Amino acid sequence: MKGDGIPDYQTCTRYVYVPGHFKKVIYRLHRFTQDGKVFEPKTPPAVFMNSSYTSSFVAGLLQLRYMYAMPAERIIHYFEDQGFNLKKPTAGFLLGRAAETLENFYKAIRKAVLSDDYIASDETYFKILVPEKNSKGKGVKKGYFWVIVGRESGLLYAVCRDGSRAGDVIYDELHDYHGTMHSDAASFYRKIQCDDFPNITRIACLQHIKRKFIDCMDTEPEAKEMVKLINKLYHENHKHKIGENSWTVEDNFKWRQQYAPAILAEIKDKLNEILKKPDLLPDSELSDAASYFNNEWEAVVDIFKRGDTALDNNLVERMNRYFSMSRRSSLFFGSHKGAERAAVLYTLALSAKMNHLNLFDYLADILDRTAKWQPNTPLEKYRNLLPDRWQPSTED
């Protein structure tokens, strides 16, 4: 520092990229003999039996595959560029064993999600290689993941059953469920409103409804008015956020009781006006939007009977983008078994994402912690290691 108070140095910043690197650690394990008996040394722990790969390697592989949507072949080339030769069968082995090892975490997440009082569901498609040829002569079939999110726990559960989109898949998951479920108006979801599911209240997605009016509002003034009315609900809903400034679920419910009835009545009047228009063409976009909204009306009103419900199902749709990223990158799964394995790993990856965890850190930690747990370990023991409760290990 100079006498005039001016520093005699200045600082500047340069950012350096250091590519990922791999370590090959060789242990020298000593045998010893006592009283004529040879004692073999214990080998360092490995995440999988008969494998030389550590939890960090497996966690890195899973992060690239299921968070960054890199297909296995691309990961192999990426590793090659960094000086490591990973064979494709080895990559497949590690991914498969990871799914098997994390199976109990998957089951524990399912149990936690379906214990949540408020869930949301959607489905998304993928392509799968099958022996049978389709009409175009290709052995490719469209399959589906069903996604259920626990809105209170922030955990995500993905299920794939032979790629089926039949309602039985979701019905089997929900047959004992008690609570509120958010979804769009696909027929298999609307069936949940019937007497077969007396303990479930299905609520609608206002964004799905609004999009239908947006699609025709350039040519239909009534559609533009309806969009403005729906936006009034969003405007009032955004004035407060649960957890901020001591705002509680009960506060939010009371606030909804104040603003929602008048706006909903205004919307219902406009909806009836559209439906009764003498010149409304049955096959028009406006007619389709109004009919869709009218069929969902009860499920819309039910949104405002709780203080903690969202106005739409956008959270699940955002999570589904990770499936679509993989779909665009990988093109297909090699088999139904591969898709079911992916459901396990996506469940862990996206649950970690929803809880703002670094997937690499999370997976490396839980793989190490549970390496010696038996397959029949009670699911309750996994509960505090799920992403919504996990705390990093304090062990060295």
Which role does the model predict for each range below?
Residues L29-T33, V38-D396:
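Catalytic center-proximal scaffold of phosphoryl-transfer enzymes
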